[in-house]
Amino acid sequence: MVESVSIYEKYFKDPKREPVLIDYVRTPIGKRRGTVVRHRGDDLVIHCYETLLNRNDFDKSVLGDSIVSCNSQIGECALDIGRNAAMGAHLPVSVPGFSVNRHCASGAQAVLSGWQAIACGAMDAVICGGIELQNKYPIMADAYVFNEELGKPLMVAPNKKILTNPEVAAKLKEFNTTLSGQINSAHVLGIHYYSKHKGISMNEFKGEYRDEFKQELDQISLLSHQKACSTYDDRAKEIEPIWCPKLDENGKPMLDENNNVAQDESLSVLTTQDEGPRPTTSIEALSKLKTIIGRKSQAFLTAGNSCPTSDGAAAQIWMTRGLAEDLGLNPRATILNFAIVGTDPVLMLDGPVRAMPEALKRANLSFDDMAFIEINEAFSSVVWSCCKELGIDWNDPRFNPWGGAIALGHPTGMTGCRLIGTNLHQLEKAGKEYAISSMCVGFGMSIATIVKNENPK
């Protein structure tokens, strides 16, 4: 039995100051034209905050910060949502707040920022989480600026100096592509890694090769829905149901006389579970969907084997082990180790290939020691590529056992927080000790986090 290495114990000496996870909760994840998007983004965070604060009895003034992640910080998700959520949840005004953005890893970054603040001694407790309303504010909505000449919003282009970065320029030339977003990268990434593992050139990727690859991607997608549909009861333990307004005949949310969401079936519906999983989907249905990018002979990505646009929020409470003991609160988990890495910004979405081995190396552990392995399903080509490179079988029962983003959705500001919290619930249910999660990140980054259950059987 190998001896695991805790990042806290390696660099800090006081066991009473080790950050511990006290509690975690999330909203159901809403789908396109679903119910969750009818809320303000900050109200979804407040819903999670209030749930945590109501079921954990302690003096809330001990909280040193409120940290909320969001990818598209626009509308009510702007204006420092970390601070606004804290005030909206009626935390003492002495509790400050800030917002963070690391694209698809934003939720994990919010948690790790809180962990780091506690570990270094800057504060004793934090409340943190993430939010995204993709069906209201699409990815990159915050990059649009109104152009007066054209009379419409235009997206601000990336700085041209990025393209002259020698490493970026070399990769753009190698893959004969442009720096033009995640869907394009998911397409190029898939062709690159499939060709690599088949021993062919990227130009040879067509015909039977393309057909075989797409079939495997659709199978990954089907597995995600099947697992998600069979684990509603497991995921229910991490979800706090939320009342969502019904729509009137004009498609407007129906609110009460005070312009608030009513907890009343005449005006609202109680959303209790994730809206995305499709129990009736099949390989036949997935295979008939139109491809969304690439020449027809090389196209394989569809709406069915990519994550859908979605909405949701999640939150956690962290504090020192000593403070938890003083307050009579039971720690549920710790972060054993983690890694934050930068990777190729052109392929962009293969970050887990570097981040997960790095986190495991730091912990002196391997995938064999992990009871559960989560890789975010932004696109099925990401899952295929990362699994092949890491030697993981996507049919392994430890892999994304409760379904992934293809079925559940990927509210980018929330997902990382959800994955850490889901690992916690998986470990508690199974009585196991370690789990790892990771995700690809826009512009080539990744975070991998190893969760350690405080109470394994």
Residues of each region from the PLM?
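N-terminal extracellular/periplasmic Venus flytrap/periplasmic-binding protein-like
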Residues: 4-11, 17-20, 26-27, 37-47, ...
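Conserved beta-ketoacyl condensing-enzyme motif
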Residues: 38-126, 130-155, 239-271, 346, ...
